[in-house]
Amino acid sequence: MNLSVALSSGDGRSLDGDIVVKLIDVRPDGVQMHVRGDVRPLRYRKGFGSPVPAKDGKKLRVAFTMPDIDHYFLPGHRLMVQVQASWFPLIAFNPQTYLENQYAAAAADYLPVTVGIEAGGSFLSLPVLD
């Protein structure tokens, strides 16, 4: 999956964040079953060896490669894609402010940001087996 996202705070600070993508199997009666999910810390969008802050309001390309899973969607079921900025308590809160060590964040470092997803620059590619 590839997403085009932009973080904005309105105050020009260096930003950070997490993008969580979940694939959901939705039954015809509306019941949802989590199939697969993954998180991408935006600071590591260029590789885990080189953290990079996000610039306020600048669009970022974020690529997800989720591990394969053997799941069969029954007739009448739908695929739901959820994109969110937190998966707490499974993943620690991200302060949204770029810090060298986000686990040493002070209360004042936790500031709101707006996460925008550009539909035209985002796509989902799934393998389909017969």
What does each model-found stretch correspond to?
Residues M1-D130:
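Glycine/threonine-rich phosphate-binding loop and adjacent beta-strand/alpha-helix elements that clamp
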